[in-house]
Amino acid sequence: MGAAAVRWHLYLLLALGARGRLVGGSGLPGAVDVDECSEGTDDCHIDAICQNTPKSYKCLCKPGYKGEGRQCEDIDECENDYYNGGCVHDCINIPGNYRCTCFDGFMLAHDGHNCLDVDECQDNNGGCQQICVNAMGSYECQCHSGFFLSDNQHTCIHRSNEGMNCMNKDHGCAHICRETPKGGVACDCRPGFDLAQNQKDCTLTCNYGNGGCQHSCEDTDTGPMCGCHQKYALHADGRTCIEKDEAAIERSQFNATSVADVDKRVKRRLLMETCAVNNGGCDRTCKDTATGVRCSCPVGFTLQPDGKTCKDINECLMNNGGCDHFCRNTVGSFECGCQKGHKLLTDERTCQDIDECSFERTCDHICINSPGSFQCLCRRGYTLYGTTHCGDVDECSMNNGSCEQGCVNTKGSYECVCPPGRRLHWNQKDCVEMNGCLSRSKASAQAQLSCGKVGGVENCFLSCLGHSLFMPDSESSYILSCGVPGLQGKTLPKRNGTSSSTGPGCSDAPTTPIRQKARFKIRDAKCHLQPRSQERAKDTLRHPLLDNCHVTFVTLKCDSSKKRRRGRKSPSKEVSHITAEFEVEMKVDEASGTCEADCMRKRAEQSLQAAIKILRKSIGRNQFYVQVLGTEYEVAQRPAKALEGTGTCGIGQILQDGKCVPCAPGTYFSGDPGQCMPCVSGTYQDMEGQLSCTPCPSSEGLGLAGARNVSECGGQCSPGYFSADGFKPCQACPVGTYQPEPGRTGCFPCGGGLLTKHTGTASFQDCEAKVHCSPGHHYNTTTHRCIRCPVGTYQPEFGQNHCISCPGNTSTDFDGSTNVTHCKNQHCGGELGDYTGYIESPNYPGDYPANAECVWHIAPPPKRRILIVVPEIFLPIEDECGDVLVMRKSASPTSVTTYETCQTYERPIAFTSRSRKLWIQFKSNEANSGKGFQVPYVTYDEDYQQLIEDIVRDGRLYASENHQEILKDKKLIKALFDVLAHPQNYFKYTAQESKEMFPRSFIKLLRSKVSRFLRPYK
């Protein structure tokens, strides 16, 4: 218990004693004293103690505070007037108290004030690859003969004897020997040392391990000069500090002329029984009083019942030390730590979740943050690989995409195609015969264009009658379509390279749809699909724009952009463009002898062009609306208009638990109530956030409400069954065939003469193969053997007859892969800029591929140098340096090397390039793999070279875990690099922002470096 706590208890005793006397009846007879303190009617400060007195009360500031009681302010024990609180290194003031901390490389002593050296070599060899040597306040790594210490000061580089002058032991360098481009050697010093005038020796400075001093250090021309706190004296070794009483005894014993003189002094001290003798028996602090000695303990310790001994307080036992997550007790203090995925805030108590989704390049598609972690998801048609990346799924590699005939893979999807003379079935998988030349002319209209005048202004409408699709691209961009393009147009190419969508002997002209594309502009409006208010959506007598043809497909793509007006002070305007594509079909049944097919087509084309002219005027005046399921939507919003009925979410979304979520599959967004409504029976919806449901292929209206895909529509044949149209009545797949999907018109043969045990099977696994293949293999129905999946494919299941292609441009290291995680991107990652950039191993943060080789070149602009930060690197040491990252001046093995490693290091390191340009190479062998690396860099003005090197070479930058986390925090590194690359950007960050971003010790370290750089002479 500290002295401040003792004073606190004394104040409590005084207050209780005063109250007891009043209860005992002291005072004037009959007088009733009012206890303002207990009634709370006093006006004492919150940091004061209320002491009741006869007829009044007193306010006494609590220990650690000063003032007259009604106003109390904290005493800053760390000020010079209080001798830094008795702390030999750093003093941190806290309300009503203070706390001592030590420089990196030291730990707090039992007295809570002194600082003792930490032997870093005891913990994982100090991170040194070979030899670790402890020193006062620091440590240093050394290498065995034939090795050089790399610039990260931990790893050792081995070089051959050829052309290496530094291999000569007589090179004369005290610390580091470097090869120069012109030949010969140049000496350098370890961090915290200055190169002497002879350019060979190294002079220790206070930047390295506090200059070897236990307390204070001051740089002089001859090296560090050590000093001690006022209660201590410098030991004869010139570095260590001892208490003055102890030092006085040592000096007096040294100067004693006789044993008798010493005996007299000892006897006198024993008789006096004061703190001068054996510190009064106190473990820590001793104070002489009228009744004898009184022992006390520093902050972080408590006095034991013997009144002499001090015991460390385990702060972690009381409310976990105030730490959010982990609490680690230390001698006289404690430290807080956080779980993985969290960071410690600058109050050194609170843990905050790291929002990885706020970082750049975290996920390719969708990022979902969660406490302590995050998850990457991919959009439909893509699959996850390498932890965060999304690659297109090649559905055609999985049993031909279940297509009956041809399969064409596309980005995020795929299409089944049919041979000439056949068309796609409604299930988009099977091919059926075309019903003559007029099959397309019988297609019903999917949309309708109409206009009507309101108040002299013509309003035009696009009414979606059938299938609609809404795809929001951003806050100011979306795509809306009605109908299905080219419903019967997907065909397989002929042998001569052409394709056909009609039956034999039919002309293409009557059945080919008319397609027209147009671009419209809306001034001073932003793309925002919004339900139109009921007051504005009045009944209007409308007339169709196209009465001689069917509109089978319309798509509207709306995107907005800012366009600056003329004049410097003119604000920019919002300009929106709508790109529309129309697909119409003639009403061939209206053909006559006076106007046959060609004539009808020409009239339809003229009608479509005339309709586009009318639409251009309507859209330009923002009088164009889209109608879906009875709800009218405005396609764009003018800034002056208030967004009515939007709530806080966009179209297709509703508010749930404070978040905007899209309407789920099986539902659609109804703009009138602004809610998600279930699909009615006979319709389905397999996508999120849509404005309508798609009619089921069956016209009978079967199926349950809320169908989430076409397979949930009623009346379809179940898996293992088929029919001519895919609807009931159905028959079972014959023996030797199977069908895994509903609503199909046929079954797939097992192949190779294989049979099934019974009819109605739904999987190839039901085929009686002669061998049951394990994952990583597929069954060959020709040879009846299990074949390993080739490189670039995988198979996670048993008994399959195919392998799945790796997503995107990824591949596998070997054949026989069993999981998509084995698929790796072979591309060497990174972005190389003049001021900032990064390099990363292929497939990062997933494991890099085997036999990879990457080369990067960093060439900064003139008069700029390169600073590199390696937050962490994962290279398996089991490979015996088969995977290597090297940075040097050029591709020549003899050029100046800046960094080289073949090991895993989770401790970050920062260093400057030894050459103006960098050639970087990463190579991996065929053995073990690892996560690899993502290494950022920044180029800075060479005038700051001395300052930057002084910072990155100071061991204090890496000793603290808080400092290490800074070099791993992508947001903080980005902020630091922003200022280093462009110093004027420093003024973007306020002092408060800096305090909230960085720990106090880190700011103090940088401030001292910058001050020394700007004012080198005192």
From Swiss-Prot:
All copies of domain CUB, residue ranges: 828-940
Compartments (UniProt record): Secreted; Cell membrane
Phosphoprotein is among the record's keywords: no
Signal peptide interval: 1-20
PROSITE patterns, sorted: ASX_HYDROXYL, CUB, EGF_2, EGF_3, EGF_CA
Matches recorded under SMART domains: CUB, EGF, EGF_CA, Ephrin_rec_like
S-S bonds: C37-C50, C44-C59, C61-C72, C78-C91, C87-C100, C102-C115, C121-C132, C128-C141, C316-C327, C323-C336, C338-C351, C357-C367, C363-C376, C378-C390, C396-C407, C403-C416, C828-C854, C881-C902
Induction note: Down-regulated by inflammatory cytokines.
Keywords: Calcium, Cell membrane, Disulfide bond, EGF-like domain, Glycoprotein, Membrane, Repeat, Secreted, Signal
Main localization of the protein described in the UniProt heading: secreted
GO biological process: positive regulation of smoothened signaling pathway
GO cellular component: cell surface; external side of plasma membrane; extracellular space
Positions with biased composition (Polar residues): 496-512
Record's comment on post-translational modification: N-glycosylated.
GO molecular function, one term: calcium ion binding
Membrane topology qualifier: Peripheral membrane protein
Chain segments carrying region Disordered: 493-512
Highest taxon, organism lineage: Eukaryota
Glycosylation sites: N255, N400, N496, N709, N780, N809, N819
All residue ranges annotated as the EGF-like domain in the record: 33-73, 74-116, 117-153, 166-202, 206-241, 275-310, 312-352, 353-391, 392-428
Tagged with keyword Cell membrane: yes
Its biological purpose: Could function as an adhesive molecule and its matrix bound and soluble fragments may play a critical role in vascular biology.
Subunit description: Forms homooligomers and heterooligomers with SCUBE2 and SCUBE3.
Name this polypeptide is given: Signal peptide, CUB and EGF-like domain-containing protein 1
Organism: Mus musculus (Mouse)
